[in-house]
Amino acid sequence: KMRTLKSIMVLGLALSTFTATEAAKLTFKVTNPNEKVKVILTFNQSGEQKEVAIDAAGNGNIEITGFTPQYVTMQYTRGRRTLYLDPNQDLTLSFDSDNMWRNTTFEGAGAAINTYLGSKELQSLGMPDMKMQEAALIHRGDSLYAANCQVLEAAKLPADFTAQEKIRLQFYTYYYFSKYALYHPHFGKDDNYIPSKAYYEKLEAITPINAGLLALKEYKAFLPDAISAFSNKGK
């Protein structure tokens, strides 16, 4: 009898653990849907992909379990954007199929963070900046990063997300900085350009070597050119 009671208690515990599993419920509302195309969600930490079918009326939903809060890349037709999903937070996403990357509205517990991530105010160095002189480029990068951090702070989001996002913003903002030695000779019409000590010092300051950061797609994109730039130092 005691054994049966123990079995029931163990089973009860297993069931309560099972029912308490955190699941993020995502609901999609798509205008002008393309039924042949699914929403693809790529989890940046694991690389795992989830697909969500969108029906003729533009509706789709999915419940996702077994993940920690993290950045996720969403793709639909040709558009893509960065999301932040949390297993404790439901999210409703509404967009036009042709305009998802530019304009998605969010509702639910995860709305504030994801609305911020789509902010038009976030800016980064770009190809046109490659013609700038070094000092001007460093100043512009620093100014953009400071402005991006202000946008983040103004959003008043949870502290743990804000701390992570400041790191992600660094690689987002300075993505082209690591490519400067590659592109400046052409765009700056300066074939004799050799990166200065100040350039390498700045590059070193914004390039932590940390395997834990490989969960950020921005870091993975930034790192190879930074390593390449360091390997050419003194050549």
Outline where the language-model segments fall.
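Generic surface-pattern signal
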Residues: V10, A14, A146-E153, L157, ...
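Terminal low-complexity, poorly structured segments
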Residues: K1, S7-L11, G118-E121, Y199, ...
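Extended amphipathic alpha-helical segments with heptad-repeat/coiled-coil character used for oligomerization
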Residues: K166-G234
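A non-transmembrane, solvent-exposed segment enriched in polar/low-complexity residues
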Residues: E22-Q164, R168, F177
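Bacterial Sec-dependent N-terminal signal peptides
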Residues: K1-T27
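Exposed alpha-helical structural elements
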Residues: T4, A112, A136, R140-S143, ...
